[in-house]
Amino acid sequence: MNNSTTTDPPNQPCSWNTLITKQIIPVLYGMVFITGLLLNGISGWIFFYVPSSKSFIIYLKNIVVADFLMGLTFPFKVLGDSGLGPWQVNVFVCRVSAVIFYVNMYVSIVFFGLISFDRYYKIVKPLLTSIVQSVNYSKLLSVLVWMLMLLLAVPNIILTNQGVKEVTKIQCMELKNELGRKWHKASNYIFVSIFWVVFLLLIVFYTAITRKIFKSHLKSRKNSTSVKRKSSRNIFSIVLVFVVCFVPYHIARIPYTKSQTEGHYSCRTKETLLYAKEFTLLLSAANVCLDPIIYFFLCQPFREVLNKKLHMSLKVQNDLEVSKTKRENAIHESTDTL
């Protein structure tokens, strides 16, 4: 997991354009933070009223929590990268905040994979009942996912235990001991592997569902396939989000990690890999703004509760306007009488 906080490259002497790393990227993260906090706050409020009656709803609720926690790390990155905060902020990002960011990003990725598996099982294997579709199993699996991700990530916090050599130029890799640098590299490879496995499974599930829908349509040519088509579109939307938000970062991730931990890269190469990593990571962070849209299209109970809350709000507003109009009419009538 990349604990690089200041977006300065690790080995000196290397210099680069700070306009990108200290101004443009922090501003963009600030925009993502505000938008994501608003959308995920609303999503969390809506899901509070949605019963956990199905596996995929449980998985969606876990994604809401992961996105919200991930979004809370953005202000620290903004303060650290822009130089607006004290040097202790950069140390905190290296040791804690960046780890939380990546844990929650991969938790979200895994749960999207589980949602796709749930949809696949429901459509392609509808006659088979399985414990993996039970609510209790989904809750247990959710706990195991969080525990696994924390198990992989927490050593990055513990092993980032070296003192700060220069407060004006804090490099995250310099805060790690020897074992910490090795774990950093190994955990990166593990997390990247998890992503590519989930992404390939998404493609397999989507392909299988599409084939099933096509065969059902040829056999029946009835509206009974409309629900399956909707599920296919839902999984396609998840695949699309993966392609836009996560694939670019995971293409850039491995070469950037190697440039951090190996010494034979030129400054120009390090700079290029740094910019590639930062902008693709920003795309991954922007996923917290897209997930609430997926909730709306993927989860019917979510839509129902949202519509109910909106109608209640509109009703209260209309009642207030009617009450205000009645009071004004009563005042006018009393004035006319006088």
From Swiss-Prot:
Superkingdom per UniProt: Eukaryota
Residues modified by glycosylation: N2, N3
A GO cellular component annotation in the UniProt record: plasma membrane
Residues exposed to the Extracellular side: 1-29, 77-96, 161-188, 256-278
Main location: membrane
Entry's transmembrane regions: 30-50, 56-76, 97-117, 140-160, 189-209, 235-255, 279-299
Membrane topology: Multi-pass membrane protein
Stretches assigned to the Cytoplasmic side: 51-55, 118-139, 210-234, 300-338
Cysteine disulfide links: C94-C172
Compartments, record wording: Cell membrane
Protein name in UniProt: P2Y purinoceptor 14
Species for this entry: Mus musculus
Gene coding for it: P2ry14
